[in-house]
Amino acid sequence: MPQTLHVHSRVKDYDILFTNHVLKTLADCLGERKQRKLLFITDQTVYHLYQTLFEEFAQQYNAFVHVCPPGGQSKSLERVSAIYDQLIAENFSKKDMIVTIGGGVVGDLGGFVAATYYRGIPYIQIPTTLLSQVDSSIGGKVGVHFKGLTNMIGSIYPPEAIIISTTFLETLPQREFSCGISEMLKIGFIHDRPLFQQLRDFQKETDKQGLERLIYQSISNKKRIVEQDEFENGLRMSLNFGHTLGHAIESLCHHDFYHHGEAIAIGMVVDAKLAVSKGLLPKEDLDSLLQVFERYQLPTTLERADVSATSLFDVFKTDKKNSEQHIIFILPTETGFTTLAINKDDHQFVEKLDSLL
């Protein structure tokens, strides 16, 4: 497997580096910046799992650490403000750097701070979950939640580099592993059916090298899409398959009920059911999606939480993917994807949605 993927960006090109030697790879990335100040942003879970790693960072660099509570509540302007306070207190300049080590929450949060402190300072992402490695770290999207609305405030601000190491996945709980698989299945179902089939048959316990290949293949797919449509005007919208409903579920439900990859799985099932009902997708493809979700213990219905179609529809109206008058869904087809625009006043769709949940 190649060790590097180079991503072309209209903002700034960057490399995705595959390694099992995080310290050495980070040192190589920093180069002459080794003498600059570094702020490592992480969460309590990662910090306690890899405390020795952070101690080594402290020995080698002029480093500071900001440790967030785990979970989506840290993607907030209050947490951003706390990190600003630390950067200012330690006299961080525009030439100093942030390094995020954690899952998607940490990466999005740290990237947003980097994008906005002094109008932009450099940062490196080290994603530690499968979901963040194959999805949220790739493409430059950074941001935080606001007043219960998912990723409402943010930007596209690419990192200097992304360091991918599967060694972090050895401590990942099965539930979080399945959430990452959910995003890999998403891109496979829309863009790479051979990848989808490989994921369907994959045996995690006996095929570590196979996992590395699947991660590389998933990232390569997303890299290709992002390079063609960085600002989500066309092709990149396909990566929102499952996300209109998924983000609404996340907004309405406690994190304990549905993690991100689980909410997206339910969203994909509903999008696929809509596609079947409109003759865009064979029923056999929907059945295949349901079977593979069951294999990875991903939910396909909203049975864990009492959420109504009406409340979901109300949240849809605030989705940033919408046009002025329409709610946008991404529907899979036999050969790719299409968009479905639902009028924000179409209350008949609420009944349709209720029948699909």
Curated annotation (Swiss-Prot):
Catalytic activity: 7-phospho-2-dehydro-3-deoxy-D-arabino-heptonate = 3-dehydroquinate + phosphate
Location within or outside the cell: Cytoplasm
EC number(s) recorded for this UniProt protein: 4.2.3.4
Coiled-coil regions listed: none
GO molecular function: 3-dehydroquinate synthase activity; metal ion binding; nucleotide binding
Pathway(s) annotated for this protein in UniProt: Metabolic intermediate biosynthesis; chorismate biosynthesis; chorismate from D-erythrose 4-phosphate and phosphoenolpyruvate: step 2/7
Manner of cofactor binding, per the entry note: Binds 1 divalent metal cation per subunit. Can use either Co(2+) or Zn(2+).
Cofactor: Co(2+); Zn(2+); NAD(+)
Source organism superkingdom: Bacteria
Residues where Zn(2+) binds: E183, H243, H260
Keywords: Amino-acid biosynthesis, Aromatic amino acid biosynthesis, Cobalt, Cytoplasm, Lyase, Metal-binding, NAD, Nucleotide-binding, Zinc
GO CC annotation terms, alphabetical: cytoplasm
Main location: cytoplasm
GO BP annotations, alphabetical order: amino acid biosynthetic process; aromatic amino acid family biosynthetic process; chorismate biosynthetic process
Binding site for NAD(+): G104, V105, V106, G107, D108, T128, T129, K141, F168, L169, E170, T171
Flavoprotein recorded as keyword: no
InterPro entries reported for this sequence: Dehydroquinate_synthase, DHQ_synth_AroB, DHQ_synth_fam, DHQS/DOIS_N, DHQS_C
UniProt function note: Catalyzes the conversion of 3-deoxy-D-arabino-heptulosonate 7-phosphate (DAHP) to dehydroquinate (DHQ).
Similarity comment text for this entry: Belongs to the sugar phosphate cyclases superfamily. Dehydroquinate synthase family.
Name of the molecule in the record: 3-dehydroquinate synthase
